[in-house]
A protein has these predicted regions:
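Charged, amphipathic alpha-helical linkers/stalks
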Residues: 459-518
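Short secondary-structure boundary/capping segments
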Residues: 94-99, 103-107, 221-223, 256-261, ...
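Short, surface-exposed amphipathic charged segments that create phosphate/polyanion-binding patches used
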Residues: 150-154, 287-295, 415-416, 465-476
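Generic long, charged, amphipathic alpha-helical segments
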Residues: 387-418
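Hard-cation-handling environments
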Residues: 229-374, 386-387, 444-448, 497-535
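A polyampholytic, Gly/Pro-enriched intrinsically disordered region
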Residues: 100-105, 292-305, 387, 470-492
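His/Asp/Glu-rich metal-coordinating catalytic cores
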Residues: 1-55, 60, 64, 71-252, ...
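C-terminal, active-site-flanking charged/polar segments
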Residues: 359, 434-479
C-alpha cells in the first residue's frame, strides 16, 4: 500500500495522486495545471497503460484535464465518477480538447511565418472523445468493489454538481487501512446543491487547502443584491452584464434571478429578458436539470417535486449560435446578459464587454473570483480603459461585485470537515493549496485537533501499511528558459523603445501651452503612430 503525490502539491492546480494497493494501480484525479506554477511535478512511476482505474472527485479541468492525455499515452482502464461528474466531463473534456487544437493551430500560423517547428497539441478531439468511453457512472453513498480487497465510495462534498470525497478501503494480508481523499470541499448552504457531507472514520486523509487562512465575508442576501443592481440598471435604460463560469456559477445566478422574478423584486419591466450566452453554460444547465434529484439539496428538490425548475424562468433566452450572440447587442431593450468566461479572458463575454463597458447606464456585475492578471481583475481594480479585439474601450459602466459567493470552503469550513472524523486519523496530508498556505494550514490542523498533518511535495511517497514515508522530496522550482543572445538583443531594443517613450512624454510636456492647431496636429501624429503599431 503506497501513496505517491504527483500534482497539486504546494500548488493549487493539477491534482493527481497515485495509489498502489491490493494489486491495483489507481490515480485519484488527473488534472491539468492552470496559471502560473512554482514547482515541477514528478512523473508517474509506471506507464499509463498500466493504470487500472482513475477515481475522479469532480469535473473541473484542474482535476480531469489530463485524462485525454493519458488516454493518448495508452491508458485504457476505467474512470470511476459520479453520474453528474460523468455528464459534465462529456462537456468539459471536449471543450478542453477543442482549446488545445485551436491554440496549436494559432501557434502554428505564427511558427510558419517565423520558420519555426510545428507545434502539436498535447491531445486532440479524438483523445477527448475516446477517453469518455472509459467513464463508469457511480451513485453517491454506494460501496463499489474494484477487486476482492479494495472498495470505494463517493460521498457528496458540496463543491460542484457531482463533486465527491472518495473513501477507499484496502486489505492486504492481515492489514486493513482506509484512506479518504477530500476532493475540493464546498461551501455550506449553497443555493442548489447539498452542503458537504462528513465522513466519520479514516486512517489517512488527503485534503485540500485552497482557502486555508482565508475567511468568506458574510454579505447578507445575494438575491437582494442582484435585485438591487438589476433594478437600478434597468431604471437607467442599461444592460446588466454578468461574467460567470459556465459550470456552477451560471446556474447559481439563474437560480437567484428565478427567485427575483418569482417574488417580483424588480418592478416596472414585466418579464425582463435574461440572455444566457454561452453554449457550454447552456449544455451544463441541461446536466444540472438531468441530475436534480441526485445532487440538489432538500429545499431545491421540493421545488422540483412541485414542477418548478430552479434554474429556468419566463424571459430566459438561451443563445447557442454566433448569430444568436451577435443579435443580443443589436437589441436595444434593457436586459440581463450572462456569459462566459467568468474572468473575461476568453469567450463571448468579451464581445458583451466591448458593447457595454463604455456605456455609463450599464453595469458589469461580477459574481465570482477574479485572478490576478485577468481582464476581470483589472476592471474590478479600476482600470479606466481596456483593450478588446484591438480596440481601446473606456470603462464608463458601473462596476459591481457581489462578495461571498464561492464554491470553496474557507478555513472555518475546512477545519469543520477534517474535525468531523470521530477518531483522529493517523496522518493528514495537506495538498491543493499555495506553497505557504499548505504548510500553514497543516500547522493549524495540528494545533486545532492534535492530528499529525504535513504538506508533501510532488514525488514524495508514503507506505500506508507501515505508516512512514518511503521517499521525501523537496520542491523543485520550475526553471525559466535560459535567455539566449537574440533574446538579450531584443531586450536591448525594447529598452530603446521605452527610452523613446520617455522622451516623447517629455516633449509632450514641453509643448504645454502651445497653439491649439499645433497641439492637435501633434496629437494626430501620435495617434496615427499608435494605430500603426497597435496590433
Amino acid at each position: 500500500m503506497r501513496l505517491t503525490f504527483i500534482g497539486a502539491d504546494h500548488e493549487v492546480t493539477g491534482s493527481c495522486h497515485f495509489l498502489e494497493a491490493c494489486g491495483l494501480n489507481i490515480l485519484i484525479d488527473c488534472g491539468m495545471e492552470q496559471g502560473i506554477n512554482k514547482y515541477e511535478n514528478a512523473e508517474l512511476p509506471i506507464p499509463y497503460s498500466d493504470v487500472d482505474y482513475v477515481l475522479v472527485t469532480h469535473a473541473h479541468i484542474d482535476h480531469v484535464g489530463l485524462l485525454p492525455l493519458i488516454y493518448a499515452r495508452g491508458f485504457r482502464g476505467q474512470i470511476m465518477a459520479t453520474r453528474a461528474t460523468c455528464d459534465l466531463c462529456d462537456i468539459m473534456l471536449k471543450d478542453c480538447a477543442h482549446i488545445q487544437e485551436s491554440e496549436a493551430e494559432w501557434k502554428n500560423r505564427k511558427a510558419m511565418r517565423a520558420g519555426k517547428p510545428e507545434v502539436t497539441p498535447i491531445y486532440t478531439m479524438n483523445d477527448g472523445e475516446g477517453v469518455l468511453h472509459h467513464f463508469v457512472p457511480c451513485n453517491y453513498n454506494e460501496i463499489i468493489r474494484l477487486n476482492d480487497n479494495l472498495e470505494i465510495r463517493f460521498v457528496d462534498v458540496g463543491h460542484l454538481l457531482g463533486s465527491a470525497s472518495i473513501e477507499i478501503w484496502m486489505k492486504e494480508d492481515d492489514c486493513s487501512k482506509k484512506i479518504v481523499f477530500s476532493g475540493d470541499i464546498g461551501n455550506k448552504n449553497k443555493p442548489l446543491i447539498r452542503s458537504p457531507q462528513y465522513i466519520r472514520q479514516a486512517d489517512y486523509v488527503v485534503m485540500e487547502s485552497t482557502y486555508g487562512g482565508r475567511f468568506h465575508k458574510n454579505t447578507g442576501d445575494h438575491v437582494e443584491e442582484f435585485a438591487r443592481v438589476i433594478q437600478e440598471t434597468l431604471d437607467k435604460g442599461g444592460n446588466v452584464v454578468i461574467p460567470a463560469f459556465a459550470v456552477g456559477r451560471t446556474q447559481e445566478v439563474l437560480n437567484y434571478i428565478r427567485i427575483i422574478k418569482e417574488k417580483n423584486l424588480v418592478t416596472g419591466y414585466g418579464v425582463f429578458p435574461v440572455y444566457l450566452d454561452s453554449p457550454m453554460a447552456v449544455e451544463a444547465t441541461g446536466v444540472f436539470k438531468d441530475n436534480m434529484m441526485d445532487c440538489y439539496n432538500e429545499e431545491t428538490k421540493e421545488l422540483v417535486k412541485k414542477g418548478i425548475n430552479p434554474i429556468s424562468f419566463p424571459g430566459l433566452h438561451l443563445s447557442i449560435t454566433s448569430s444568436d450572440s451577435v443579435a443580443i447587442n443589436f437589441n436595444e431593450e434593457p436586459k440581463v446578459i450572462i456569459s462566459a468566461a467568468g474572468m473575461c479572458d476568453a469567450g463571448r463575454i468579451r464581445h458583451h464587454l466591448k458593447h457595454n463597458l463604455w456605456r455609463p447606464e450599464c453595469t458589469i456585475l461580477f459574481a465570482g473570483y477574479q485572478a490576478v492578471g485577468t481582464l476581470g481583475r483589472s476592471i474590478i481594480e479600476g482600470r479606466e480603459e481596456v483593450k478588446l479585439f484591438g480596440e481601446s474601450i473606456e470603462v464608463k459602466a458601473r462596476i459591481e461585485k457581489i462578495e461571498g459567493i464561492s464554491g470553496h470552503a474557507d478555513e472555518t469550513g475546512l477545519l469543520e470537515w477534517v474535525g468531523s472524523f470521530m477518531e483522529k486519523p493517523s496522518q493528514v496530508f495537506v495538498v491543493h493549496g499555495d506553497d505557504t498556505v499548505c504548510d500553514a494550514f497543516a500547522e493549524t490542523v495540528k494545533e486545532t485537533y492534535g492530528i499529525n498533518a504535513m504538506a508533501p511535495f510532488s514525488g514524495s511517497s508514503y507506505d500506508l501499511k507501515e505508516g512512514c514515508f518511503v521517499t521525501v522530496t523537496k520542491g523543485i522550482p520550475i526553471q525559466k528558459p535560459a535567455v539566449n543572445e537574440a533574446t538579450k538583443k531584443a531586450a536591448g531594443v525594447f529598452a530603446r523603445l521605452l527610452a523613446a517613450c520617455d522622451r516623447l512624454r517629455r516633449v509632450v510636456m514641453h509643448n504645454e501651452g502651445g497653439a491649439n492647431k499645433d497641439l492637435a496636429r501633434f496629437a494626430d501624429q501620435i495617434n496615427s503612430l499608435c494605430d500603426k503599431w497597435d496590433r
